[in-house]
UniProtKB/Swiss-Prot annotation:
It comes from Homo sapiens. InterPro entries: ATPase_NBD, Hexokinase, Hexokinase_BS, Hexokinase_C, Hexokinase_N. This is Hexokinase-2. D-glucose 6-phosphate 1 binds at D84, L85, G86, G87, T88, D209, T232, D413, G414, S415, S449. The keyword Kinase applies. Belongs to the hexokinase family. Pathway: Carbohydrate metabolism; hexose metabolism; Carbohydrate degradation; glycolysis; D-glyceraldehyde 3-phosphate and glycerone phosphate from D-glucose: step 1/4. Hexokinase activity is specifically inhibited by 2,6-disubstituted glucosamines. The lineage of its organism: Eukaryota, Metazoa, Chordata, Craniata, Vertebrata.
Length: 917
């Protein structure tokens, strides 16, 4: 018993000594985590070089765009063919994908050989052979009469210019077909099919095996955004942000990058890591100086590395008693499969002996232990190097997404990964050690790259179908020049109807006289109070106008909230609240009890009977205070002031915000004769000739007309321009059938239009993978400020996703692009409609004055105009386009409509004083 224990101990010690001896000898092949992180850092730099326009030509790691812009989302369906060519055999596959709530893939495939003489013959022979095999396969399945889409996996270095156009850079893996390098392989295969003439197919996509692997796994796991192959060769691909890919135009979305990482180190960046054995392998290879990283890690070279180490150690008399056999000296005799077999056993001694004896050697126990250890070191180094480069890719994706922790899946294929007993486990452990901030899942691709090519094709078909469906919906919101001219024409007709005594009562565009007959002339002076009520907040202002235009205007103001219960209570409660706030403001300014002239900006539809008498026609913007509609708001305000008995005010003028805006800008620019607001609501005013204002007596001079253009279309005159989404938003609003034009252009409604379109797209499976979240069903979540943020040019899709996440909408990159597109279309239409209305106004002023050309300024205010990144520009372009005889300038009103009310009061006081004199 003791003897056997001693013997076991002796062998263990012997084994241990032998292992240590090999470890020392191969010290440079054993890489620490520190070294691996350094390699990872270098690889990151190489990736950036490959992506940059200026550095790409000289970069070793080519980072080739694949034009694959999306991974599967599980809704793909249809029948597809795939060709998988990447070695001496190639496969033809028929893939049927069904999506009836259960993702299901059916496959038929057949393997065809490529004879050596065809591999080395002409390109025509090669592609004719492929077409023949394809015909044979389609015959068997009896599908020759169908024109099916085909995906082509072509695993050779290519320069891809489109999804279905790929130029072979150079043959590898023993292929030498003449006349193919530098040519588009898709065109060559199409020609071969045409030469036969007995079937037709639609070649949609050409991809390499790495991309195929990512797509195959992406169908089962939607987090899969990296593809890895470690087999005869090695390569990886991953989804990169378009904004970083300089070789392809466009910044939106993502694209899969075929890294061609086998060439890492070809520029010398791994020279300190490569050993004498790596150099020897390279010198004896078919492509010296090329694919140096691949030669350190892939199955084609691993066995050869072990053989070279065994030879050198034998020559130095460290193994086999210094004896060599002819077989051991023969290149390629030690195969990668042998490494897997030897490492597959616990101690590997029996298998090592078998392999070494096959090579004509007579190994001792120590020789077998050493061989086992050499295999371990070579395969572990391979897994570690793979892990280092993968860590760089994961780190990059994590930074691209700006996530604290990245959840990502890597789709993997290749004989080394699948067949080596420990490679996968070592790779996983090392990756997780090197990037602790990532939760990485490795998913084996079971059906290889052929199914992946079919998936790329299926995704391309899905994207094209979905794109067509979305465009069909969105085209109703995209207005042509002629359509916009028609909107302008109709607006002019409605303006006429509102101004005319006969038609005014039934006209939706009310064209209300404001009794403001002059703009500032610069001689106004004095202290004025202004009230500005037009939304859930209102302002009280003290405006000090110094004599002369350059004396300027000094302003003090305070903002007060109007609680919802007051908005929806009685009129007395609302006006008592307003007076309470005025009292607070006067006290705050140290002016308690002072009597001042007051201008009141009241931004609701009113019928004005004089400058200081204005009858509220109807509440808008969510107000519902009872007992106000049909009443004079100045009287309601005065009554509330008397109820308080604390101060008295001289209410000189009541105006709406649009007029206030025109007056504010008129103080700066004498050409300003139009006011426009595009914010929560929308409206416009302008200086009309008195002779046309039939509701007011007098023919001389001009008067500002408050158009109340939000109601344009309430008589059905815009019905052919309204979409189902406009109708839905209108029906669910507080005032169905009213303010239809406003509901197509103003900030209060654009987000709702977008939300309704997104719901429609989701129901039809064109967005958010067809899943409608409860959040998306919630009215009002899509605030217009989000539209402004989403469309901001400096915002990457990443931030768009963050906004959508904040709204509780889990979105992919593709979803973010679609949401952004919808926002763009809706906001653009709003700006164009607004521009068409404005063109009608300025053209009317020009025609009123009988001018060939008019120079006019529009004073503008409102959050949509000011904050949306493109609204103003699109609107300006539209006005220029539709009213070419008018030179229109736009002046932003900086101090809002409150200052305008004070200026109107100042002008009125000036005119009143002049009259008294």
């Amino acid at each position: 018993m003791i003897a056997s224990h001693l013997l076991a101990y002796f062998f263990t010690e012997l084994n241990h000594d032998q292992v240590q001896k090999v470890d020392q000898y191969l010290y440079h092949m054993r890489l620490s985590d520190e070294t691996l992180l350094e390699i990872s850092k270098r690889f990151r730099k190489e990736m950036e070089k490959g992506l940059g326009a200026t550095t790409h030509p000289t970069a070793a790691v080519k980072m080739l765009p694949t034009f694959v812009r999306s991974t599967p989302d599980g809704t793909e369906h249809g029948e597809f063919l795939a060709l998988d060519l990447g070695g001496t055999n190639f496969r033809v596959l028929w893939v049927k994908v069904t999506d009836n709530g259960l993702q299901k893939v059916e496959m038929e495939n057949q393997i065809y050989a490529i004879p050596e003489d065809i591999m080395r013959g002409s390109g025509t022979q090669l592609f004719d052979h492929i077409a023949e095999c394809l015909a044979n396969f389609m015959d068997k399945l009896q599908i020759k009469d169908k024109k099916l889409p085909l995906g082509f996996t072509f695993s050779f270095p290519c320069h891809q210019t489109k999804l279905d156009e790929s130029f072979l850079v150079s043959w590898t893996k023993g292929f030498k077909s003449s006349g193919v390098e530098g040519r588009d392989v898709v065109a060559l295969i199409r020609k071969a099919i045409q030469r036969r003439g007995d079937f037709d197919i639609d070649i949609v996509a050409v991809v390499n095996d790495t991309v195929g692997t990512m797509m195959t796994c992406g169908y089962d796991d939607h987090n899969c955004e990296i593809g890895l192959i470690v087999g005869t060769g090695s390569n990886a691909c991953y989804m990169e942000e378009m904004r970083h890919i300089d070789m392809v135009e466009g910044d939106e979305g993502r694209m899969c990058i075929n890294m061609e990482w086998g060439a890492f180190g070809d520029d010398g960046s791994l020279n300190d890591i490569r050993t004498e054995f790596d150099q020897e392998i390279d010198m004896g290879s078919l492509n010296p100086g090329k694919q140096l990283f691949e030669k350190m890690i892939s199955g084609m070279y691993m066995g050869e590395l072990v053989r070279l180490i065994l030879v050198k150690m034998a020559k130095e008399e460290l193994l086999f008693g210094g004896k060599l056999s002819p077989e051991l000296l023969n290149t390629g005799r030690f195969e990668t499969k042998d490494i897997s077999d030897i490492e597959g056993e616990k101690d590997g001694i029996r298998k090592a002996r078998e392999v070494l004896m096959r090579l004509g050697l007579d190994p001792t126990q120590e020789d077998c232990v050493a061989t086992h250890r050499i295999c371990q070191i070579v395969s572990t180094r391979s897994a570690s190097l793979c892990a280092a480069t993968l860590a760089a890719v994961l780190q990059r994706i994590k930074e691209n997404k700006g996530e604290e922790r990245l959840r990502s899946t890597i789709g993997v294929d290749g004989s080394v990964y699948k067949k080596h007993p420990h490679f996968a486990k070592r790779l996983h452990k090392t990756v997780r050690r090197l990037v602790p901030g990532c939760d990485v899942r490795f998913l084996r691709s079971e059906d290889g790259s052929g199914k992946g090519a079919a998936m790329v094709t299926a995704v391309a078909y899905r994207l094209a179908d979905q794109h067509r469906a979305r465009q069909k919906t969105l085209e109703h919101l995209q207005l042509s020049h002629d359509q916009l001219l028609e909107v302008k024409r109709r607006m002019k007709v409605e303006m006429e109807r509102g101004l005319s005594k006969e038609t005014h009562a039934s006209a939706p565009v009310k064209m209300l006289p404001t009794y403001v007959c002059a703009t500032p002339d610069g001689t106004e002076k004095g202290d004025f109070l202004a009230l500005d009520l037009g939304g859930t907040n209102f302002r009280v202002l003290l405006v000090r106008v110094r004599n002369g235009k350059w004396g300027g205007v000094e302003m003090h103001n305070k903002i007060y909230a109007i609680p919802q219960e007051v908005m929806h209570g009685t009129g007395d409660e609302l006006f008592d609240h307003i007076v309470q706030c005025i009292a607070d403001f006067l006290e705050y300014m140290g002016m308690k009890g002072v009597s001042l002239p007051l201008g009141f900006t009241f931004s609701f539809p009113c019928q004005q009977n004089s400058l200081d008498e204005s009858i509220l026609l109807k509440w808008t913007k969510g107000f519902k205070a009872s007992g106000c509609e049909g009443e004079d708001v100045v009287t309601l305000l005065k009554e509330a002031i008397h109820r308080r008995e604390e101060f008295d005010l001289d209410v000189v003028a009541v105006v709406n915000d649009t007029v206030g805006t025109m007056m504010t800008c008129g103080f700066e620019d004498p050409h300003c004769e139009v006011g426009l607001i595009v914010g929560t609501g929308s409206n416009a005013c302008y200086m009309e000739e008195m002779r046309n204002v039939e509701l007011v007596e007098g023919e001389e001079g001009r008067m500002c007309v408050n158009m109340e253009w939000g109601a344009f279309g309430d008589n059905g005159c815009l019905d052919d321009f309204r979409t189902e989404f406009d109708v839905a938003v209108d029906e669910l609003s507080l005032n169905p059938g009213k303010q239809r034009f406003e509901k197509m252009i103003s900030g209060m409604y654009l987000g709702e239009i977008v939300r309704n379109i997104l719901i429609d797209f989701t129901k039809r499976g064109l967005l958010f993978r067809g899943r409608i979240s409860e959040r998306l069903k919630t009215r009002g979540i899509f605030e217009t400020k989000f539209l402004s943020q989403i469309e901001s040019d400096c915002l990457a899709l990443l931030q768009v996703r963050a906004i959508l996440q904040h709204l509780g909408l889990e979105s992919t990159c593709d979803d973010s692009i679609i949401v952004k597109e919808v926002c763009t279309v809706v906001a653009r239409r709003a700006a164009q409609l607004c521009g068409a209305g404005m063109a009608a106004v300025v053209d009317r002023i020009r025609e009123n004055r009988g001018l060939d050309a008019l120079k006019v300024t529009v004073g503008v205010d409102g959050t949509l105009y000011k904050l949306h990144p493109h609204f103003a520009k699109v609107m300006h372009e539209t006005v220029k386009d539709l009213a070419p005889k008018c030179d229109v300038s736009f002046l932003q009103s900086e101090d809002g409509s409150g200052k305008g009310a004070a200026l109107i009061t100042a002008v009125a006081c000036r005119i009143r004083e002049a009259g008294q004199r």
